[in-house]
Amino acid sequence: MFQKLKDYIKKDWKFMLLILGFMLLNLIIVTINYSTDCDGIYINGLFKTWYSTISVIMIIVLGGFLAFKVRNADKDNIKLEKLYLWVAIPIGLIMCFNTPLGKVPDEDDHCKKAMAISQGNFFSVADENGNAIEMINAKVHEFVTRTVDNYDDALRRATLPETEEKIPLKYNTMALYAPICHAPQAFGIFITRLFGAGITVQCYAGRLVNFAVGLVLLYNAIRLIPFKKYLVTYLALLPVTFNVLPSMSSDTLTIGMSFFYIAYILHLKYNEEVKEITKKDKVALTISTLIISLCKIVYIPLCILLLIIPKEKYGSLKKKNIFTIIVIISAIALNLIWLGYCSRYLIEFNTGVNSKEQVLFILTHPIEYIMILARTINFYFNTYYAGLSGDALGSYTVKASEIYICATIGLTSILMLGNIEGDKKVKIDWFTRLIAAMAFIAIVLLIYTSLYVQWNPYMNPLIHGVQPRYFFPIIFLTSLIIDNDLLVIKKKINRFILTYATFFNINVATATIYTYYFGVLINTYIK
């Protein structure tokens, strides 16, 4: 027996050492957290608290199991998209239940909107001041709130007695979202309500259904993408993804649908087995385009990616142009109709905001506005990059290890610039690069401009309010724009990528438990 174990370790000692290294790193971080604010720690690893016990179980048992699942994937003939589910499902479930409701950005308002839709109220009602209001169960207001500081507080609110009382709750920003954005969450809430479940169960059902929809979309994105499969898988496993995936945020649908949409179009263009665009493909493209355009209007430029599909796969240039024009015009028209309806809820949230004057300023002073954009990007660049790499998760209070954040920045750059041996190598033509660049730039401009108009004071020298997660749905486009033949990466890195992402998420999970157990703003940095 011992000889077999010895041979097993000797056969792949480098990977074994890698796993032990990740385990040790995470255990050190847990130890630092524990010893910083708590007494009674045993340095030999025998922890007294449930926090330490759960952390050790996640690091050693779950981390070890998933790492060896990754190691044996080739031998067990597990496809990459299925391997993604093996890692994503347990990580997502942990994040779903160890992050208190409301501790994801804007989740309190997303929950109210989903509750309203589950009751059949697809369109908000405005009060005399123009605020969007809805009669929501009083327990929702008490239970799903971003003021929860710790698990004790969250548990107390979750176990409050059920009530039939309804109170008017405002959610102005959510009134701008089309009902489709909260359809998965609303479905989970509606089904559990049919079976007589209380508010707590309804809310977690909303999270779980939303999580399932996001997983299905990302699974199919990995399955369909003809190249850069490991990059897509890696991005889909980053903590910034799992920060919103198992929540009630509409960002789940936005991220999942954007990844799926890009992958599907690239599949139709570069997959040699796809000889023609079928009716099924046209239906899928049309529905996907309309959903993306309704998720957030700033992402509507993604629809120009339809232009990269070769005319030969439509049968003729005329057929391609007719279909593409109809789909794009339909998406724009649908957005204009929705914007025309919900514009009644466009109110100025902050002091000094004047949307009409701000639009006029941008149109009449384009050079000055470009300078404001450049100044903002330069000022917040580190914040954006760190945020996309795992800094300030949860409701901006959960911080991953600085080691993981720095490593993620480097690893993401390498995967963007290179190709893994064995992955399908595709020469991206100049037209695809151009369209991808146009879509990327247009979306970035819309993100900044929409917030500058609605959120920032008139002629403000910086654009505040832009969150790093806003860029995540389009991050893959950068790999289409830049030359991806600059590096040739050894195939063995694929195991490292998935193992790294697994332990990074476990680090975030333990940091989340630490944050909400002690109710403090933590730094899990190793200096």
Where are these regions (language model features)?
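Membrane-lumen/periplasm interface segments of multi-pass, membrane-embedded glycan/lipid transferases
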Residues: 336-422
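Short acidic/glycine- and proline-prone juxtamembrane loop motifs at membrane-interface regions
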Residues: 247-254
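Transmembrane-helix signature of polytopic, membrane-embedded enzymes
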Residues: 197-200, 219-242
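Membrane-interface alpha helices of multi-pass inner-membrane proteins
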Residues: 243, 280-297, 302-308
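Transmembrane helical bundles and short interhelical boundary loops of multi-pass, membrane-embedded
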Residues: 30-54, 339-353, 493-527
